[in-house]
């Protein structure tokens, strides 16, 4: 693949965290580095083990292939390969691949002399994954509380986990996470629409500037966050959504064991609701 006109001058040696100059090269447009090799190794090994699991399961249908964690009776110990051991090794591979990819992003940032915002953001995705397959199962005492690797089976796990604690929508951290997800979608949809509007003016007119974009929202709602500010806001909203998604899971079954609707009894029991005729406490 041909280099872009400006690309070659940014391909400079150095900035590596591990391995020195050994893997400090590119394959086409892709920077390799030690962590690129590590990512490939972990990803390839994980895929091979998933294929092995498919052989043991007796199906090659992608919708039916599923790698299950060990049964609850194994606790936090190792399990035979066919009874959850493959899931444990694949989880190690997935974690290794994700962390290596993030560190590869760090090396690219070091080469370009830019901030570490991208690997920092990706670290939140890793946090969410590890919450489900490592932190929460360890806190609950068994790998069997983690989700299986399968298209349909992991959806069944989500449903079963939710209904185990009643209506999961009453989980306050879940409420906050969903609010951030929707707000993030709204903010970035408005941002994308605004940029496309400025880039596609009426026929015969020049492309509009950020001043036009700012003026639109000042006219609309009285305030514009600005071209840089909207990206800061988008990052804040998206990271908050991921953080509270992880939080809503880590507190379920570890510090809260009942149905989530019961958590809201503190609201019902507030003194100013008491003795209201026809009210819940009346």
Curated annotation (Swiss-Prot):
(7R,8Z)-bacteriochlorophyll b binds at residues 154, 174. GO terms for biological process: photosynthetic electron transport in photosystem II. A ubiquinone binds at residue 217. CDD domains: Photo-RC_L (cd09290). The keyword Magnesium applies. Keywords: Bacteriochlorophyll, Chlorophyll, Chromophore, Electron transport, Iron, Magnesium, Membrane, Metal-binding, Photosynthesis, Reaction center, Transmembrane, Transmembrane helix, Transport. The reaction center is a membrane-bound complex that mediates the initial photochemical event in the electron transfer process of photosynthesis. Reaction center is composed of four bacteriochlorophylls, two bacteriopheophytins, two ubiquinones, one iron, and three highly hydrophobic polypeptide chains (designated L, M, and H). This is Reaction center protein L chain.
